[in-house]
Regions:
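Active-site-proximal helix-loop-helix substrate-binding element of RNase H-like nuclease domains
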Residues: 23-31, 67-193
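Long, highly charged low-complexity segments
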Residues: 1-72, 86-101
Length: 193
């Protein structure tokens, strides 16, 4: 380079620059835990009034035939979400209240690895209808050579680093299933510090 020329700044940054991801502690959000029928019916009404919503199933594992549904999570707007714990005692009531929402063809449903969620819900007696968007498939179509897991997509698309699943359930010999995770830590409301 001559004295007047300087190399262009790299858009990728330095090899040693770590991206500053947003986290659950830096992004204002409201997470609701649905613990009674009134709150569940209010959530169902809100989902029914929307043109689309995001959802996820929480299960005791990845075996559609052997594991069970232990929770459902939903989002309609950014930075607000609901978690509905499902234990054997309330599962029938939860599913009967949410079935019309899942089976409403007018409402689009969005998720990550939706095929698994659809199979879990079908095994629980719900036939999800309407337009489906699977963020994992969409990302695969856009970038087939990359990883497509939810944590990776959150980092590259949203500049957000989710709470690692290991922080909730542990790993190895001490790993627990999602039905044994205390609900409050997963739905803690926060404002950034």
């Amino acid at each position: 380079f001559s004295a007047q020329e300087t190399p262009a700044a790299s858009a990728e940054g330095s090899l040693f620059d770590a991206p500053a991801y947003q986290t659950i502690d830096t992004v204002p959000h409201v997470y609701h835990t649905v613990t009674d029928e009134k709150a569940l019916r209010e959530l169902a009404g809100r989902l029914e009034a929307s043109s689309e919503f995001c959802f996820d199933t929480e299960t005791t594992g990845f075996d559609v035939f052997g594991d069970r549904l232990v929770g459902l999570s939903f989002a309609v707007e950014p930075f607000e979400a609901w978690y509905v714990p499902c234990d054997p005692a309330n599962l029938g009531q939860v599913l009967s209240i949410l079935r019309p929402v899942f089976e409403n063809e007018r409402i689009a449903k969005i998720g990550q690895n939706v095929k698994f969620d659809l199979m879990m819900l079908r095994s629980a007696g719900i036939d999800v209808r309407g337009t489906l968007y699977d963020t994992m498939i969409v990302h695969y179509l856009l970038d087939p050579e990359s990883r497509h897991g939810m944590d990776h997509l959150a980092r590259i698309c949203l500049n957000y680093s989710p709470v690692p699943i290991e922080e909730l359930i542990g790993k190895g010999a001490r790993q627990i299933t999602m039905d044994r995770v205390p609900v409050a830590p997963g739905t803690r409301p926060r404002t950034p510090t």
